[in-house]
């Protein structure tokens, strides 16, 4: 394994200062060292791998050699959430949750996605500059609470907004990576407030013994209750879906708006495509834009694993108990795989072209591929098509940089001027997604 000398270290530091993100140093190290390197930080020296071959080892062929992680803020917050448990426990929770996120359920979710999007966008004044990072978060939060838990949180947004953001901040990378026991102030109260809110939803549903009959439907919350899970385990799954689900959708929507704003010609092409149809199954350019947004700025940009058994990456060995990061961000920008890898080129996904192997993994891969992958992509298609049909978006040309939080999001936000289009739009115009 090549060492990081002082010259390369200075280049990495300069890149960090220039890009205001650790992604800069990662790109520098990857370009000079290759697909495997170790970052020599104080008290923390994680190994980093990327590329299709490494992804195959970590996600498929040798996945039993890696475990999720030791105790940290993520495990503290999410408890036994499906995202972070291993083995049979993971498989059990996943099996319980998959029916509510299956593609067959998406048609009934479409109406909710549109109505929640309309709710938020109806608050915009014509010609107003809005932050599409914030607005996307509102939309995604409303959608996930309504579709998976049948909970309308519109009137509670002010109540849960800060607790949700503090929860995301709590699990975002920070000094705790270097020093696990570092004091962290200002989290206890908002995290408890969010817990109380979720436990309240569970309690309310348990009291409604005939909810399925009266509502004529079922949802994820009901599946978990019917499975006999404790309130604590149900809370863990709810919080996992709430935080991981809505935060990834927020990042995807915000980055897509940013990219369209930075590429007005493609923006107009997408608008023209959407104007020609009410069928959300027939928007190939929009689908390619979403895929390219996921390639350039994957919401979950890095996977964090702990080595349970020594692993070998092309002769480079990682001992047991070491920390391994597999970088989705670097994989998606590999110049050996992607032509014009740093550029926004939606056409690269045209004509049904599929990236080779595991060189494209915005939702992970293998048996633990993101349980909400299809839901998230359909949600993006519905929200974007509805808003682009209803509004013109003008980017304000401010500088944006990727921020490595719980997800990879555009900072300081995506400021866009919104103007209502004369084209009439309502939810009944859309055909259901099949």
Predicted segments with their positions:
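Cytochrome P450 proximal C-terminal region
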Residues: 30, 117, 134, 160-167, ...
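Conserved cytochrome P450 K-helix E-x-x-R motif and the immediately C-terminal K′/meander segment
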Residues: 13-34, 196, 278-314, 335
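Cytochrome P450 heme-thiolate "Cys pocket" and heme-binding signature region
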Residues: 95, 244, 302, 316, ...
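Conserved cytochrome P450 K-helix/beta-meander segment immediately N-terminal to the heme-binding cysteine loop
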Residues: 326-353
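Conserved cytochrome P450 catalytic core segment spanning the I/J/K helices
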Residues: 12-14, 75, 98, 102, ...
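Cytochrome P450 fold signature focused on the C-terminal beta-domain
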Residues: 209-217, 271-284, 296-316, 331, ...
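Cytochrome P450 catalytic-core helices
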Residues: 248-267, 271-273, 374-389
């Amino acid at each position: 394994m090549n060492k990081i000398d002082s010259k390369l270290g200075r280049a990495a530091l300069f890149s960090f200062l220039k890009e205001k993100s650790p992604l800069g140093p990662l790109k520098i190290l990857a370009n000079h060292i290759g697909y495997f390197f170790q970052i020599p930080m104080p008290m923390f020296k994680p190994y980093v791998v990327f590329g299709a071959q490494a992804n195959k080892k970590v996600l498929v062929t040798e996945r039993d050699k890696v475990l999720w992680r030791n105790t940290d803020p993520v495990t503290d917050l999410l408890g036994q959430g499906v995202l972070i448990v291993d083995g049979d426990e993971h498989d059990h929770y996943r099996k319980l949750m998959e029916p509510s996120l299956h593609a067959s359920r998406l048609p009934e979710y479409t109406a909710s996605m549109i109505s929640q999007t309309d709710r938020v966008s109806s608050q915009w004044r014509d010609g107003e500059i809005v932050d599409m990072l914030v607005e996307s978060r509102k939309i995604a939060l409303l959608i996930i609470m309504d579709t998976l838990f049948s909970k309308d949180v519109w009137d509670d947004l002010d109540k849960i907004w800060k607790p949700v953001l503090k929860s995301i901040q709590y699990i975002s990378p920070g000094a705790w990576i270097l020093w696990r026991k570092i004091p962290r102030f200002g989290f206890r109260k908002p995290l408890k407030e969010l817990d109380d809110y979720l436990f309240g939803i569970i309690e309310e549903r348990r009291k409604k013994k005939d909810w399925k009959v009266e509502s004529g439907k079922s949802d994820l919350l009901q599946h978990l209750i019917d499975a006999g899970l404790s309130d604590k385990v149900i809370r863990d799954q709810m919080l996992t879906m709430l935080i991981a689900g809505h935060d990834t959708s927020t990042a995807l929507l915000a980055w897509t708006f940013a990219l369209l704003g930075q590429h007005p010609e493609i923006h107009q092409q997408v608008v023209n495509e959407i104007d020609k149809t009410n069928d959300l199954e027939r928007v190939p350019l929009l689908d390619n834009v979403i895929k390219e947004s996921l390639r350039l700025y994957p919401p979950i940009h890095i996977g964090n694993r702990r080595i349970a058994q020594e692993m070998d990456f092309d002769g480079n060995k990682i001992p047991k108990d070491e920390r391994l990061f597999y970088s989705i961000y670097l994989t998606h920008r590999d110049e050996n795989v992607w032509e014009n890898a740093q550029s926004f080129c939606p056409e690269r996904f045209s004509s049904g072209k599929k990236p080779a192997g595991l060189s494209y993994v915005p939702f992970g891969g293998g048996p633990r591929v993101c349980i909400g992958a299809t839901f998230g992509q359909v949600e993006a298609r519905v929200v974007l098509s509805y808003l682009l049909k209803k509004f013109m978006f003008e980017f304000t040309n401010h500088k944006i940089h990727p921020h490595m939080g719980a997800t990879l999001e555009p900072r300081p936000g995506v400021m866009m001027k919104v103007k209502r289009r004369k084209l009439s739009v309502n939810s009944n115009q859309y055909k259901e997604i099949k």
